[in-house]
Regions:
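Phosphate-group recognition and catalysis centered on beta-loop-alpha active-site segments
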Residues: 1-161
């Protein structure tokens, strides 16, 4: 039996409720509290860029409107994903998956990547996220943990990894 290679305590969406979820600010705050593994939600922009967001729509955690997966990354990257939480986080952007992955790799943090596809893009999202993760973690001793509540997303990830 192999041993579990990941920390047992995982900071949900970065720093849970302490900072705006799924932002680099949340990851930095979680690390400051001692967390060494993080969970994040990754979906695709309309032009295929993986980025972090839990909800299907933008309204709850940003100043955007509509379905997140219908927007190009150029639009999504300009949104304020911090003000909904508090004024202290105003201007915090939605991060790309690559930015969060590089932060984790640079700081020795493990990552649980929950694949959160836009409905109808389950398999594609799994494929793209898995390819990005494989490229970013190439040569690393401990790969990221890929999870999803969407079986088609996991199937796509399995075939791409």
């Amino acid at each position: 039996m192999t041993t579990w290679p990941y920390p047992y305590w995982i900071a949900h969406r970065g720093a849970g409720k302490l900072a705006p979820e799924n932002t680099l600010a949340a990851f930095r705050l979680g690390a400051a509290h001692g967390y060494r593994m993080f969970e994040c939600d990754v979906k695709l922009s309309a032009d295929g860029v993986p980025f972090l967001l839990h909800d299907a729509t933008l309204q709850r955690t940003s100043n955007g409107q509509g379905t997140a997966g219908d927007q190009p990354w150029a639009t999504l990257s300009q949104l304020d994903a911090g003000s909904w939480h508090s004024r202290a986080w105003a201007g915090e952007p939605l991060p790309s998956f690559e930015a969060v992955a590089r932060y984790c790799l640079r700081n020795g943090h493990a990552l649980n990547i929950e694949i959160k596809p836009t409905p109808g893009a389950e398999r594609l999202t799994g494929e793209v996220v898995a390819r990005h993760a494989a490229r970013l973690w190439a040569g690393q001793a401990t790969p990221p943990l890929l999870t999803s509540f969407q079986p088609d997303a996991l199937e796509g990830a399995r075939h791409s990894a």
